[in-house]
């Protein structure tokens, strides 16, 4: 099923990239939590945010978003076909157990621990086993560093963490994403608008 879902999503994204409107594209098959494959080329996608510092968890995170989702403006919801991938790195530690930092105070990335993916498709939220944890039409996947082997993480925990941010389309760091785009001069949204 994972392969079928990946092929259906890829076909939809190719059609959108080729200029077909999303309305004219056949919708991708419904995907359940744990079935959404990590696209092989995701590190070539626009960066959502990089070097997200999580000293509380001893982690550094890089987040990517596919071109379908990267063009929205502030206050807009991500369209169906959006996929976001998060690389979760262990922060390096000094011999005394403290977290290693760069001269500018940022945590230093160590080994890649896991890869998480979230994708949005029409009706995908209807597949959620616990309706009280529905995050719109988003589904989630959690994989080991190879981005193929399921990590065994409880997807309900992902859903529970994203649930309180419905006003941001269930996407953490939504506002930070737009602030970063404006600050770096990358704020070119559909229709040419800026926040």
PLM region spans:
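Short, low-complexity disordered leader/linker segments with a strong preference
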Residues: 1, 21-23
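Bacterial N-terminal signal peptides that target proteins for export
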Residues: 1-9
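Intrinsic structural disorder/low-complexity segments
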Residues: 5-6, 62-64, 165-168
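Extended rod-forming repeat segments used as scaffolds/tethers
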Residues: 9-10, 176
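C-terminal motif of bacterial Sec signal peptides marking the signal peptidase cleavage site
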Residues: 16-19
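Sequence context surrounding c-type heme c attachment/ligation sites in exported
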Residues: 23-32, 36-50, 57, 75, ...
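His/Cys-centered metal/cofactor-coordination and adjacent catalytic loops
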Residues: 47-71
């Amino acid at each position: 099923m994972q392969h079928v879902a990946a092929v259906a999503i890829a076909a939809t994204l190719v059609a959108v990239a080729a200029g077909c409107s999303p309305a004219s594209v056949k919708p991708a098959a419904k995907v359940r939590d744990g079935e959404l494959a990590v696209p092989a080329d995701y590190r070539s996608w626009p960066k959502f945010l990089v070097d997200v510092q999580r000293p509380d968890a001893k982690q550094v995170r890089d987040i990517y978003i596919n071109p379908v989702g990267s063009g929205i403006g502030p206050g807009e919801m991500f369209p169906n076909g959006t996929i976001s991938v998060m690389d979760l790195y262990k922060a390096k530690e000094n011999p005394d157990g403290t977290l290693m930092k760069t001269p500018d105070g940022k945590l230093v990335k160590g080994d890649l621990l896991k890869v998480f993916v979230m994708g949005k498709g029409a009706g995908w939220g209807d597949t959620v086993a616990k309706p009280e944890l529905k995050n719109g039409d988003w589904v989630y996947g959690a994989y080991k560093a190879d981005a193929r082997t399921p990590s065994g993480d409880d997807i309900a925990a992902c859903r529970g963490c994203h649930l309180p941010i419905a006003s941001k389309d269930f996407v953490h760091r939504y506002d930070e994403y737009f602030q970063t785009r404006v600050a770096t001069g990358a704020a070119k949204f559909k229709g040419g608008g800026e926040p």
